[in-house]
């Protein structure tokens, strides 16, 4: 979907609502509140798009995993991993947010992290092998980034029957909470 298509859908879904501002969790890199490249799993036209003009209110845009991380954060050093279509990631250290792009880092001799824990990997590998990969990647990144805990979110995080040690599951409304947090 293009930004125009999504904005049309949002306006239709919120018809009759009054709002003063908009928070957008964007599935890709964001710098200074602006998308840096078109997302891999959506249409073109995101870079340079005028969201303020389209919505007619102030807009803040951050990476979607970063938004969910903000709504999940419980203090200290936390790594957020979003298990959805791809692999989203963000790091929060003592309240300071650092969006990450870990998805395309190499994983063993098996492609990238995303190729082993994204939605296509779940379908290709099956739940048992996919779960093993999630546990392995969580442990690998937890050690490498020296975090106290990992938060797992995204639609496929619910597929995990158990969680790796020092891991929590992000709440369903974490992205919404993160969107509110942006305006504090």
Predicted region positions:
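Short beta-strand segments
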Residues: 23-27, 80-86, 153
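Short, acidic/turn-prone active-site loops that include or flank metal/cofactor-
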Residues: 1, 85-87, 103-111, 172-181
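Short glycine-rich, Thr/Ser-proximal phosphate-binding strand/loop in the N-terminal lobe
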Residues: 1-8, 12, 91-124
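A short, acidic, amphipathic alpha-helical segment used as a generic capping/interface helix at domain edges
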Residues: 130-143
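Glycine-rich phosphate-binding loop and adjoining helix at the ATP-binding site
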Residues: 1-11, 16-77, 116, 165-184
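Glycine-rich phosphate-binding loops at beta-strand->alpha-helix junctions
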Residues: 141-175
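Hydrophobic, well-structured mid-protein blocks that either form specific transmembrane helices
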Residues: 63-100
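Glycine/Thr-rich phosphate-binding loops of Rossmann-like dinucleotide-binding domains
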Residues: 32-33, 89, 160
């Amino acid at each position: 979907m293009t930004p125009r298509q999504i904005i049309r859908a949002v306006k239709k879904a919120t018809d009759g609502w009054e709002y003063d501002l908009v928070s957008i969790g964007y599935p890709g890199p964001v710098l200074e509140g602006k998308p840096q490249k078109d997302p891999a799993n959506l249409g073109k036209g995101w870079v340079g798009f005028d969201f303020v003009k389209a919505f007619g209110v102030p807009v803040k845009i951050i990476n979607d995993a970063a938004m969910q991380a903000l709504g999940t954060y419980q203090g200290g050093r936390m790594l957020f991993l979003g298990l959805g279509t791809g692999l989203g990631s963000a790091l929060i250290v003592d309240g300071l947010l650092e969006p990450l792009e870990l998805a395309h880092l190499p994983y063993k001799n098996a492609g990238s992290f995303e190729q082993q824990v994204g939605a296509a990997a779940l379908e290709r590998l099956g739940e048992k092998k996919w779960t093993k990969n999630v546990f392995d990647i969580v442990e690998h990144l937890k050690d490498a980034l020296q975090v106290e805990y990992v938060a797992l979110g995204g639609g496929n995080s619910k597929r995990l029957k158990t969680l790796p040690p020092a891991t929590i599951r992000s709440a369903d409304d974490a992205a919404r909470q993160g969107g509110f947090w942006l305006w504090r």
